[in-house]
Amino acid sequence: MGLMNRSKNDEYVKLLGAWPSPFVLRTRIALNLKNVAYEYLEEEDTLSSESVLNYNPVHKQIPILIHGNKPIRESLNIVMYVDETWLSGPPILPSDPFDRAVARFWDVYIDEHCFTSINGVAVAKGEENINAAIAKLEQCMALLEETFQECSKGRGFFGGENIGFIDIGFGSMLGPLTVLEKFTGVKFIHPENTPGLFHWADRFYAHEAVKPVMPDIEKLVQFARLKFNTSIFK
């Protein structure tokens, strides 16, 4: 069961998800930030789930937010919908059109480059390929460190004083990053190489909207061992 107050217009809110998914985590954090009460339904097999096939017949993927009888799909799309639908809590996206465009750009970058780089390390085979995948992920972290310094302007989050769109997009990847750090021995978020991200991650983990829904790292470790049959996870 989710948190907080009744939803807008007393319409029922339901979230279909799976606990290891960083994309599902995004939607849960956004709902918590906006103090939205919702029912969370764990979907163990999305490919055969009747609910998933019914509400997302095209991609057959989670997360799916159901507001009343309306399904909203894709994690970033859901986060934007939550921000625009519920005015309670801090805004997730900036009000300035340019700043909104910047935030959306970086979340797309996180999905297209950082998340794919995380998966690239996880599935890499052979020392040369593993090292190349690690180097690519380190480049992503270096660029996000620069982005944090620019967007935060000396404050605690990418979004300024509060968690924003980029925080949610990247923060949802912290669990998988930590799992990779455990198995590779590489610190992708390091106090010397990425000091801004290092301290940001502590603040993100501790946030009241985040802490209750972050997956347990040891459970993620076991999940990764089962999902990825590569030498990294042996």
UniProtKB/Swiss-Prot annotation:
Its main location: cytoplasm. Keywords: Cytoplasm, Detoxification, Stress response, Transferase. Residues 96-228 form the GST C-terminal domain. Residues 11-90 form the GST N-terminal domain. GO terms for molecular function: glutathione transferase activity. It is found in: Cytoplasm, Cytosol. It is an enzyme of class 2 (transferase). It catalyses: RX + glutathione = an S-substituted glutathione + a halide anion + H(+). GO terms for biological process: glutathione metabolic process; toxin catabolic process. Its EC number is 2.5.1.18. Induction: By fungal elicitor. It comes from the Eukaryota. Glutathione binds at S21, P22, L47, S48, Q61, I62, E74, S75. GO terms for cellular component: cytoplasm; cytosol. The keyword Disulfide bond does not apply. InterPro entries: Glutathione-S-Trfase_C-like (IPR010987), Glutathione-S-Trfase_C_sf (IPR036282), Glutathione_S-Trfase (IPR040079), Glutathione_S-Trfase_N (IPR004045), GST_C_Tau (IPR045074), Omega/Tau-like (IPR045073), Thioredoxin-like_sf (IPR036249). Belongs to the GST superfamily. Tau family. May be involved in the conjugation of reduced glutathione to a wide number of exogenous and endogenous hydrophobic electrophiles and have a detoxification role against certain herbicides. This is Glutathione S-transferase U11.
